[in-house]
Swiss-Prot record:
Pathway: Nucleotide-sugar biosynthesis; UDP-N-acetyl-alpha-D-glucosamine biosynthesis; N-acetyl-alpha-D-glucosamine 1-phosphate from alpha-D-glucosamine 6-phosphate (route II): step 2/2; Nucleotide-sugar biosynthesis; UDP-N-acetyl-alpha-D-glucosamine biosynthesis; UDP-N-acetyl-alpha-D-glucosamine from N-acetyl-alpha-D-glucosamine 1-phosphate: step 1/1; Bacterial outer membrane biogenesis; LPS lipid A biosynthesis. It catalyses: alpha-D-glucosamine 1-phosphate + acetyl-CoA = N-acetyl-alpha-D-glucosamine 1-phosphate + CoA + H(+); N-acetyl-alpha-D-glucosamine 1-phosphate + UTP + H(+) = UDP-N-acetyl-alpha-D-glucosamine + diphosphate. This is Bifunctional protein GlmU. Coiled coil: none annotated. Catalyzes the last two sequential reactions in the de novo biosynthetic pathway for UDP-N-acetylglucosamine (UDP-GlcNAc). The C-terminal domain catalyzes the transfer of acetyl group from acetyl coenzyme A to glucosamine-1-phosphate (GlcN-1-P) to produce N-acetylglucosamine-1-phosphate (GlcNAc-1-P), which is converted into UDP-GlcNAc by the transfer of uridine 5-monophosphate (from uridine 5-triphosphate), a reaction catalyzed by the N-terminal domain. Gene3D superfamilies: Hexapeptide repeat proteins, Spore Coat Polysaccharide Biosynthesis Protein SpsA, Chain A. Binds 1 Mg(2+) ion per subunit. Acetyl-CoA binds at A380, N386, Y387, S405, A423, R440. It comes from Enterobacter sp. (strain 638). The lineage of its organism: Bacteria, Pseudomonadati, Pseudomonadota, Gammaproteobacteria, Enterobacterales. In the N-terminal section; belongs to the N-acetylglucosamine-1-phosphate uridyltransferase family. The keyword Transferase applies. GO terms for molecular function: glucosamine-1-phosphate N-acetyltransferase activity; magnesium ion binding; UDP-N-acetylglucosamine diphosphorylase activity. The active site is at H363.
Amino acid sequence: MLNNTMSVVILAAGKGTRMYSDLPKVLHTLAGKPMVQHVIDAANELGASNVHLVYGHGGDLLKKTLSDDKLNWVLQAEQLGTGHAMQQAAPFFADDEDILMLYGDVPLIAVETLTRLREAKPQGGIGLLTVKLDDPTGYGRITRENGKVTGIVEHKDASDEQRQIQEINTGILIANGADLKRWLSKLNNNNAQGEYYITDIIAMAHHEGHEITAVHPTRISETDGVNNRLQLSRLERIYQAEQAEKLLLAGVMLRDPARFDLRGTLAHGRDVEIDTNVIIEGQVTLGHRVKIGTGCVIKNSVIGDDCEISPYSVVEDARLDAACTIGPFARLRPGAELLEGAHVGNFVEMKKARLGKGSKAGHLTYLGDAEIGDNVNIGAGTITCNYDGANKFKTIIGDDVFVGSDSQLVAPVTIGKGVTIAAGTTVTRDVAENELVLSRVPQVNKQGWQRPVKKK
């Protein structure tokens, strides 16, 4: 029966010894964000009134990493089992709310599954998420009488007959706050592990005459936990396969779904084509008919209609208007902006720079802290010298400017419309419209000159 309010408890106190890492286990990433963040996001999407995070190992780093989330931090100083962890959070439970118990190392749990679990919880009883496994070794078994759930027996405490049961406990459950506090106060550690098992409350509820309703997830992988890096890598591939399938069904052409990673969210138009080994990070928007070549990384960027990003280009916190082309081997750093029809070629880097409509920087160029007008040609080897060792300065280039190869523009400097900058020029002062600028050293040709000969 659906209660009006619900709080979520996320257990995240484990050290993760088998990860062989100094990083708390739940902070290891899946699809570009910490495992526990996936669970927090699910809790928030469910509309949880409060999210209680039970922590132990690496608490300072957890708090720093998750500082943007509104969490109630609950310390479990000693890891004495799941029941003990819930006991630490129990003082924060309201009697008239539902309490949903989740795990920071079970990152793929689906909101749809949790919604069904919440809706299935009987009045005064417990909603329990279970799955059936061909090999349930190591998991707590679900015991039933006449089809009704009566309890959970941990593998180490189970009889030979009970170990034949294939239905196992996932650890995810929901119960009323007042009931849960009462059951938690009765837990003991009289078992093979010497721990306080949250699973013991199932038998308590049954003995009190309360109903326990079991719900199954849509996919077993939703309840898979992570104890080592191998398991984490497997969940990563499961997650990525699911995301690739959704994109393909929505009309995005992934040339090889097994070689595509989505580490954030992707909004897209029609007829988008993505080649192999492309990584999408953060929030990315691709317009209609966008083409992305192999090996590209796109992060927190907006790519307009009919743009083409050639292989091995990196685009971060950038914006491309319609019909722009970049790469191969181009790098757009935060603040880069290309207006309609602009082109950035191989080994060109932009940061905090705007390239106007139809303007081109074909190769071997750095454009930083710059405003570049329309129909500008930036020759190979051009550098905007924006940093004096202490401060950054801006370069402004007007429309229809031609910048010859191997030129340096020492900021702060403004280049007027229609200016031509001869190859090899170092520009240190502002230039008025339609002027020619050159600062080459005069060429000297020495006839009959011979190279020095090495002494043997």
